[in-house]
Structures are given as C-alpha cells and as structure tokens.
Amino acid sequence: MGDIQSISRRAFVFGSAALAGGIAFGSYSNAESVATSGSGNPLASGLGPNSVTFNPWVEISPEKITLIAQHADIGQGVGSVQPIMIAEEMDLDPGPFEIRFAGPSPAYFNTGFADEFAPFLAADQSPAAEAARAAALESLRKSGLQMTGGSSTVPDTYEKLRIAGAAARETLKAAAAKRSGVPVADIRTQSGHVILPDGTKIPYSNYQRKPRRFRRCRK
C-alpha cells in the first residue's frame, strides 16, 4: 500500500488529470447529491439510496464494494489487475469485492496513449517532452477516447488507479475521524476496515452519507 505523498509529481499530475476533474480527492457522490454534484462520475447516476462513490472506479454499498475495470479483458488478465491495483491502495484483501467492467464514459479515456502520441522517447523527461505529453493527454481527455489495445492497460491505469484507491481510503479515514472524534492521524485501515485506536473496526461498507454514527464491531 502506498500513499498520495509517495506518488511522484508526474504520476500525480497525469493521474489526477485522468480522474474526471479531481473527484477522487476528498469527496464523494451519493444518491441524494447526484443532481447537484456535477462531478462527471459515471457511477453517480446509478447509485442506490445508501451507496456512495468516490471516483469512477470505487462504489460502496451496505452489501458490497464494487471496483471498476475500465479496460476490456481480451485474454491478458487485465480484468483482474485493474481492481487489484485499487484494492491494494484501499487496504482491501483480494476476493471480498465485486469487479465490474466500465460502461462507456469520457471518464475512462485512455491516458496510456499520451506517451505514444508524443514524438519523444519514453525515458525523455525534458521540459519539451513533458509539454508534448501534456498536450497529448489534454487532446485525449477532450476526445474521451476509451479503448483497450496496444498494451496500454497498465501504463494507462497504474498511476490513476493507485491515486483513486489511496484517495478513497483517506476519505474513509477522514469520515471516521469526523464521526468518532478521533484524529485522522491515529486512524489506520486494514482488510476493508477503518480501525480506531481502541481497536474498534468499522467496515468500509458501513460508510453512508448521513448516518448518526458508524456501526462498530470488535475483533
């Protein structure tokens, strides 16, 4: 598991640009707020009354956690590697989550082609090369090009899915801190639970929009 601070500046810039307007960072949509959120999150419009979504790749309901695979699996196993990258950053064990393939949406545009479209070697990180990649990325964002191919799945998703998972985890911790009165620095996560200093374990699936309190469980 990583954290947002440990992700490189280039990864952060490219990843956050791919997160449909930054909706993964400290915010969420739910069924009550969809009409006014303007988040651009394709998961927001289909949420149940007690479900939340932090970004286009994470949806949580009282019954399950759903992770979205935006690239089609055409035999290479990318349908598994994408949600596993999110799960690693969210502190989710393999298995206790549902994998769903993404529907059509500009939020899932393929950033992996940005390097290919720029006339520079991949190892070239000069200002000119970075500017060309940024321009290519902006062009891809505007076109909303959502496709699988060219061995682009991991280059496209590795950074932004890590950021999406880490941001969802930190948002859950912040919510637990607000509702428990415990400083967020004293809260940790493990195996799909937020854990308070006294050992109280709060399942991620208990996260709701306006609960009076988290439902808690002990070890």
Q: What are the language-model segments listed below?
A:
Residues 159, 163-167, 171-179:
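Alpha/propeptide regions of enzymes that mature by internal proteolysis
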Residues 5-6, 26-62, 189, 194:
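C-terminal segment of N-terminal export signals and the immediately downstream linker at the start
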Residues 90-91:
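Catalytic phosphate/nucleotide-handling subdomain of diverse soluble enzymes
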Residues 2, 65-85, 95-166, 184-216:
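Short, surface-exposed loop/turn segments at secondary-structure boundaries that line and modulate
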Residues 2-20:
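N-terminal secretory signal peptides and thylakoid transit peptides that target proteins
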Residues 21-25:
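Hydrophobic h-region of N-terminal signal peptides that target proteins for export
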